[in-house]
Amino acid sequence: MKRAIILILDSLGIGAAADAPKFGDAGSNTLGHIAMEAAAGRADIGRSGPLKLPNLSRMGLGHACQLSSGYFPEGMDPAAPAAAYGYAREISSGKDTPSGHWEIAGVPVLFDWGYFSDHDNSFPQQLLDAIVDKAGLPGYLGNCHASGTEILDRLGEEHMKTGKPIFYTSADSVFQIACHEETYGLERLYELCKITRELLEPYNIGRVIARPFVGEGKGKFARTGNRKDLAVEPPAATVLKKLADAGGDVVSIGKIADIYAHVGITHKHKATGFDQLWDATLTAMDQHRDKPAIIMANFVDFDSSYGHRRNTAGYAAALEEFDARLPEVMAALGDDDILILSADHGCDPTWPGTDHTREHIPVLCYGKQVKAGPIGERATFADIGQSVAAHLGLPRMDYGTSFLD
């Protein structure tokens, strides 16, 4: 049976989009700048030298970056790729995770999300009062834009003493809630997020994110793998839902199910960290052979651990770690399978601030029936969803053009 294995390298942009100036992101290039820093010896913590990505290079990542940005990533292997490679522009209004993923699955976000734009006192008082009342809270902390790690150091101890949850946001359409797993309780945090999700309906906010953490005090706090995203449902049927409705298997690895609000997902594998994500992907490929299938994984640590934290050396090391296991999936492909590597937005670790960057994404497609070579600029991320639909014999999506035609 035909299958599509889709691996999302969360935040691996490959060059600023034409509308990047609108977002303050003109000149951003997540991969290009990581490669530049690595080649210059400025990303040598835990690794050293130029980026060593032989397998991603074989997939055409460097060549896709060159098509997108006009220059080849410094230090990467320029050998001819064995896959189809190109880059895609985003037509969705935002540079956030749901917008990128939904557009990849054929449903671009052509409306404007709601945002909490004020950096301090970010949330409407009426909303905060309603959350406190309905959840029976002693109060709240934060109410601001913040980096997830910084705000734990600043407010984590007070949260543990008072039981007040930490509320914060970013440039994305998001309401984030951080609570200590042991002193506050994980299920209690999830219930608080559910209440908040319901109260946010009039505000058109994309996601509520539970951000559980552990640790004894400042400098010792760490997020756990029990993050949970409560997203609104996509406004139309994604290619995932179309396959599920047709009786196929749609397998979520990691946070994919949360991003699509669990719509169109038939099987879920919880996984945290690269090794678990790789292992779960390989397990799913072994288990789902008898029906047409989409197996989709999100490698979130690129974004959450290195992009937002502006950790260039960590991002470089993570790319090399990802690259080392890529051959396992390539070897597990059947004769009629395709492997697609892409991203959902950028998050340039060399860029000012802590937010995502508006960039093109790589579109890399490998398979025994796939013609290697350039597929050029794709007018929308939805070309990926359209290509998956074509590969699996599903009805055409409303957006996108297949690069497999």
From Swiss-Prot:
GO terms for molecular function: magnesium ion binding; manganese ion binding; phosphopentomutase activity. It is an enzyme of class 5 (isomerase). It is found in: Cytoplasm. The gene is deoB. This is Phosphopentomutase. Keywords: Cytoplasm, Isomerase, Manganese, Metal-binding. One of its GO terms (cellular component) is cytosol. Its main location: cytoplasm. Pfam families: Metalloenzyme. Binds 2 manganese ions. Its cofactor is Mn(2+).
